[in-house]
UniProtKB/Swiss-Prot annotation:
Species name: Legionella pneumophila (strain Paris)
Record-listed phosphoenolpyruvate binding positions: K22, G95, R123, Q169, R346, R387
Assembly: Monomer.
Gene assigned in the entry: aroA
UniProt record similarity statement: Belongs to the EPSP synthase family.
UniProt GO MF annotations: 3-phosphoshikimate 1-carboxyvinyltransferase activity
Protein name as it appears in the record: 3-phosphoshikimate 1-carboxyvinyltransferase
Phylogenetic classification of the source organism: Bacteria, Pseudomonadati, Pseudomonadota, Gammaproteobacteria, Legionellales
Length: 433
């Protein structure tokens, strides 16, 4: 078992980049694989989750070179060129791989099956199997959870689907199925979710319409190979945005970070708490906005986090809770029940961990209350969740004594170079087994 020890530090200073965006990396493989022609992807995240997606397409006959220095070259086979995999597709720990692949595979002429690790096998899949079945797909789960068994050769029909809650994975799953369905597939969102799929469709020259809060797609299009630069992942930058904000004397610059407006909830929340975050040198990598982020220490104050921020910061809440633990006053969050359905129950894991470190935290069914103050040393269990592990590693920098974090191997799913990058800013994080 891989564990971390994170020791208290003085201040954090320096300039870093973070690995490529995980959401965009997954999608670059998917659309590159079903494109006509070759795609060259730079900035690809070679973490375990995205490698699971890459290997899935290799098993379906797509030739993919790399990753080599974050470059991947994909030799697309076109929309109808995928071949039946010889084995069950293992999505390992990646819910994105499983949910997006399910939409694509539901439209193929061959049978397939998707499985994953112990954590993934606990995650809810009815949210995709039900609308796919409405489209005419034959998709079965085990009591609403993986593995997913898909019978190919089914004729899909477009539907108008009103999203019951914000979920980029469900939306993307249905858009991928809609690329093969008879008639239009229309998806209406009542709350904003990540729009990387819609942007990626445009990057690969596939027609998609956005009208009155709905996304419309049909099968009358093809993806075409392209060149793509992937920006740094704001979900990975989040750990260092918070770290610099809560560690006195800190001054950190993070270059080339994606600032897609459906992902910048952490900047809005921390700014409301009093953080000193400057967004510099704004530009674009294709369809995705990018900037450099300059963060300096500032005393934070507790706030009531608006529920409207939940889909815009869903993956960043564990480390936002660390910021709240260092803020003056109380921080509350409601409307975030989805956090209990991630790689772990992130509300439960953070409440337990914060209490272990002397911070008063209470969990609700859909949120949390944290009384800010000081973080003590101690030991916490990440529950095998990469974002919990990295969040408590950040806490160690400002704790009164070292923080030991158990069960950290899954950090490799999203940020394999986390410890190296952190220590460049003068963290003192050690790994041990």
């Amino acid at each position: 078992m891989l564990n971390f020890i994170s020791k208290p530090v003085g201040c954090l200073k320096g300039e870093i980049t973070v690995p490529g965006d995980k959401s965009i990396s997954h999608r670059s493989i998917i659309f590159g694989a079903i494109a006509i022609g070759t795609s060259v992807i730079d900035g690809f995240l070679d973490g375990e989750d995205c490698i699971a997606t890459l290997k899935a397409f290799q098993s379906m006959g797509v030739r993919i070179e790399g990753p080599d220095k974050q470059r991947v070259i994909i030799h697309g086979v076109g929309k109808y060129g995928l071949k039946q995999p010889q084995n069950i597709i293992d999505c390992v720990n990646s819910g994105t791989s499983m949910r997006l692949l399910a939409g694509l595979l539901a439209a193929q002429q061959f049978d397939s099956q998707l499985t994953g690790d112990e954590s993934l096998l606990k995650r809810p899949m009815l949210r995709i199997s039900r609308p796919l079945s409405q489209m005419g797909a034959d998709v079965t789960t085990q009591d609403g959870k993986p593995p997913i068994v898909i019978k190919g050769g089914k004729k899909l029909n477009g539907i108008h689907y009103v999203m019951p809650e914000a979920s980029a994975q469900v939306k993307s799953c249905l858009l991928l199925a809609g690329m093969y369905a008879e008639g239009q597939t229309k998806i209406t969102e009542n709350a904003v979710s990540r729009d990387h799929t819609e942007r990626m469709l445009r990057t690969f020259s596939y027609p998609v319409q956005i009208q009155d809060g709905a996304i419309v797609i049909d099968r009358n299009g093809e993806c075409h190979g392209t060149r793509l630069n992937i920006p740094g992942d704001i979900s990975s930058a989040a750990f260092f945005i918070v770290a610099a904000s809560i560690t006195p004397g800190s001054d950190v610059l993070i270059r080339n970070v994606g600032i897609n407006p459906t992902r910048t909830g952490i900047i809005h929340i921390l700014t409301e708490m009093g953080a000193d975050i400057r967004v510099l040198n704004q530009r674009a990598y294709g369809e995705e906005p990018v900037a450099d982020l300059h963060i300096r220490y500032s005393q934070l104050k507790g706030i009531d986090i608006p529920a409207s921020m939940v889909p815009l910061a869903i993956d960043e809440f564990p480390v936002i809770f660390i910021a709240a633990a260092c803020a003056q006053g109380k921080t509350t969050l409601h409307g975030a029940k989805e956090l209990r359905l991630k790689e772990s129950d992130r509300i439960g894991a953070m409440v337990d961990g914060l209490n272990q470190l002397g911070v008063h935290a209470e969990g609700f069914d859909d949120g949390i209350l944290i009384e800010g103050g000081s973080i003590q040393g101690g030991e916490v269990n990440s529950r095998g969740d990469h974002r919990i592990a990295m969040s408590f590693a950040i806490a160690g920098a400002v704790a009164s004594a070292p923080v030991t974090i158990k069960n950290c191997a899954n950090v490799a799913t999203s940020f394999p170079s986390f410890v190296t990058t952190a220590n460049m800013l003068h963290f003192q994080i050690e790994e041990y087994s």
